[in-house]
Structure formats: C-alpha cells, structure tokens
Amino acid sequence: PSHYAYVKIAEGCNRKCAYCAIPIITGKHVSRPMEDILREVEGLVHKGVKEFQIIAQELTFYGVDLYGKQCIAELVDRMAKIEGVEWIRLHYAYPNNFPVDLLEVIRRNQNVCKYLDIALQHISDHVLSNMLRHTTKEETISLIKKIREDVPEITLRTTLMVGFPGETQADFDELIDFVKWAKFDRMGAFAYSEEEGTYAAINYEDDVPKNVKQSRLDRVMKVQEGIMTELNFQKEGKVFKTIIDRREGDYYVGRTEADSPEVDCEVLIPHSEGALNIGDFYQVEIVSADTFDLYGTVVEQSA
C-alpha cells in the first residue's frame, strides 16, 4: 500500500552473534547520512505516505560510524517534526548498549508509535553467552523494566530462538518462565538451524534433536498465544487510532499503533458500516478480540 513505507537507515551489522549470517552477507554497519534519510521521508510524505517503518539490521548502532555516537534518538526526533508524518515505527533494536534517550523521544512525540521491536533471542545466561550476545539475563530484565517504566503504554515485540546448541531443558524452562513474566505484546520464535560460515556452525555441534527443537518451539508459542489472547481481550471496549490498509471480503482491515504491517494483529471492521478510505486513520472501538485479530466499529474519522 502507498500509505506506509519502509525506510532503511543503515545496512550491515557489526555484531557477531554466533548463529547469524547477516554480517557475513551484508558486511559492517554503514549508517546513511541523517539529511539523506530526512529528505527521503519528506519526499515520501509528498507522495502520500503517512506511516514510516524505520528499519536496519541494528537500529541502535545508527550514527556511530558517521557521527561517533548513537544518533537514533536524534534522527527519530527530527523525523517526527516533519509535517505529514503520522506514525513512525522502529524495527530491530538490540538490547546491548540500548540508547535510553530514545525512550524519551518515543514518549514525547505523538507520532512516534509506542512500539519497539527488540530481538532478545534468549534469557538463560548460558545460552546468551554461547550465542555471543554480550548481554545477561539481569541486564535484559532491567532493560525491559526501564522501557516499560519510561513508556508505560509501549508495545514490545521480540524474537526468540529455541534449540540453540547446548540449550538444556533447564535453559528452556528459564526461557518459558521469562516469557510468562515479560508478557510480550508480540513475539516471533524460531528453532535454531545452522547457517553456513557462522561461528555456531564452525564451533558448535547442532546437538538439540530436531523433535526436541520442534516441541520447544510449539511450547513457547503456545504460552505466547495465551498471553496475546489475554492482552487482546483487555482491549475490548477501548478506542484506538487505526489506519485502514485494505478491503478484504466483508471487512476493512486496519492496524492500531501496536501493530506493524504483515507481522502483527489486524483490526477487522465490517464494511456494512459504510465506506472507509484506504490509508486514512479512524478512531475504532474494539468490540471483540481473539488471539490474532481485533474486531472493531468506527467511532469517528481521525484528523
């Protein structure tokens, strides 16, 4: 759809997580100059784009190579001041050395979605160490608490990996307990598979049996589905600013601030309610919910 766009602010990654081939494929992190990005956003606004998905393999490193410091907060703050930018959404932050000044920018700017996609991968110190993640359970939990303290309404999305070489049942149980505690709004999970040329492929034996990986993946997703269902039910009766993406069958399909295109929940609004404009914002009351979808009715069109 022409009302949202993906804006890549950097290419490559300097981190060397054991399982990941991205640095091998894309090379070192290279930030785009800030003025270039802002010009691109202004150009897209003129073409009718309202929502901007800001993407990079590693957002939080943005600017270090160009300006000698983390500049993601400054970039987002400047982007938010561009007239016509309705929503800015951030994808793929890294927990280690997270720039906490970004939280203030998210909190302060109405048009920066209270949404953060931060891939944590695991919580067991043993697995995090084997993954070369350079962070700990304690640091991860502190960061989640800090994010939620500073931006109470934030939607947190994460990605987890099960079955990494050396993952024991105790490690996995720790991960499940963490998922239950953290109650992530959105989560993707994967079973480890070896990527050629990576540190893990060269140095570790892929020793968690395939069936164990699958059962762990099923288990973590089942726990998460329960959490998402509960969180979605809590939205019933509340009103959310919603962007309309498309018409499908008997429904208009939209998303709230808490939902990124193609990966998160959607809001279904019966088109018997009347014509809605694709790409426009409406205030929508959620009348019912299930694990992956919300069902709503339009209260008013947003300015």
How would you name each of these model-derived features?
Residues 17, 37, 54, 90, ...:
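Conserved, mostly hydrophobic/aromatic
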Residues 2-35:
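Canonical Radical SAM [4Fe-4S] cluster-binding loop centered on the CxxxCxxC motif
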Residues 200-303:
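Terminal RNA-binding accessory module
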Residues 191-196, 232-233:
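AMP-binding (ANL) adenylation modules
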Residues 63-85, 130-131, 194-226:
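Radical SAM enzyme [4Fe-4S]-AdoMet core and its adjacent flexible, acidic
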Residues 24-53:
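Conserved alpha-helical substructure of the radical SAM core
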Residues 46-172, 180-181:
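Conserved SAM/AdoMet-binding glycine-rich loop
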